[in-house]
Amino acid sequence: MKIIAVVFCLMLNAGCSDNDDLTEEPPGPVHNENISIGSGNPELILAWKENTGYTVTIAGWGQKYIPVDEAIVCLEVFPVGVQSSKWYRAAYQEAEKQNDRLVCKARIITDSGSDFEVTDIYTVAENEDRLRLSRVVDVMKASGKDHAFNSYFMVRNEVQQAITGCEYFIPSLIYKDESNLSESSIGADFTHDWILAREERMGLPLAMFRNKSSEVSVALADYNLNPVTFKEEVGMDHLVNADMHFGSLGFYLASQSPALVYCFPGSEGEHTYADGGGSRERRWARRSHPVRVGVEHAYMLELQFKKEAAFPKALEEHWKATFNLYNPEVLEVDNEDVMNYSLEVLDHYWLKDNDAPGFPFSVHLPSGEVNEISYSMGFVGMQIPCAYYLYRKGLETNNSIYTDKGEQILDFWA
């Protein structure tokens, strides 16, 4: 028993010793030289670079794509009381492969001390030539001196390319190039550094360019099933509000090669329709989130890679891939109810303008107040068909009000 006690005391003394030789430094971060997911179409490759972080390369159909300025994370921050912004760029400082996904982290601290943590999660759908990104930006600390911010995702071809070496596509806005656009259209001037359009202006939230020589196209799509804004979100003022959850898509043309761009929330420029259109001035309609702890700043994107011999086929394939991504639900409705509600609207808006019966051209929403009558343009071609349905329903249901209103329009216009 005495021997055991002595040994125990010696062990205690050793554990409490001030001998520095027995103190081990905690292990430092371990960085893999290369981390990748996917096997070529596409493949995401991260390579560790001392004093920088992980460089990012995305491969697809023999082409390589890299972030603009080699910075996969880009934040545009607007200081308090200053009209201009400051850009902050960062590489990933941490990366971990978890089965079929890659989790990456970056940190940006502004000059005034605001602290942002960015978490990106990548997954690859190899059989479909797709790379998906889920991004969350957390404001860890707000210094009080930074007012607002936007985050960007921007990638370009690794090889230098002329703007004219590519063909471009944004549904409903740009088809191949600017040659068939009016001077006031978004995308009409490829001398601009930026062509960014809000995604609700598009048939689908998608931007694509195709290299003419390699025939490889890459597209960036927003996988946002619940875009959100509010009624007062209009006009050219720089609006800062945490309730805006929509993006803008397009191209950055001031780099060594054209770049695909996603901006969140969705600022629009260098040409915008927020001013009503009709102007070729370089103007921005900026939308930003507040620099505030707890603000929700998250989105999901998809990069698609195709190789097609002709631009129309590439356009078609990217369109189908994005449409299937959304997979919109076909809702069952009662068409009889739809017809009845429509007739109620016609009955409500029936009016006489200078003794001429008809329906107005437009109304304000959500108030429903009549905005324009304009019998001489636009809706004039539908006065007779609408009156016919109102008149017929009146006869079928013995509704004398419908019959009388429909008859007056038919007598006047026909």
Where are the regions a protein language model picked out?
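Well-ordered alpha-helical scaffold segments within catalytic/enzyme domains
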Residues: 384-400
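Low-complexity, Ser/Thr/Pro/Gly-enriched N-terminal "stalk/linker" regions
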Residues: 18-21, 295, 309-376, 408, ...
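Solvent-exposed loop and edge beta-strand segments that line ligand/cofactor-binding
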Residues: 279-286, 365-383, 395
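Bacterial Sec-dependent N-terminal signal peptides
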Residues: 15-30
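Beta-strand/loop-rich accessory regions of lumenal/periplasmic or secreted enzymes
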Residues: 37-38, 46-48, 52, 57-293
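Sec-dependent N-terminal signal peptides
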Residues: 3-12
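Short Pro-Gly-centered flexible turn/kink motifs
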Residues: 288-312
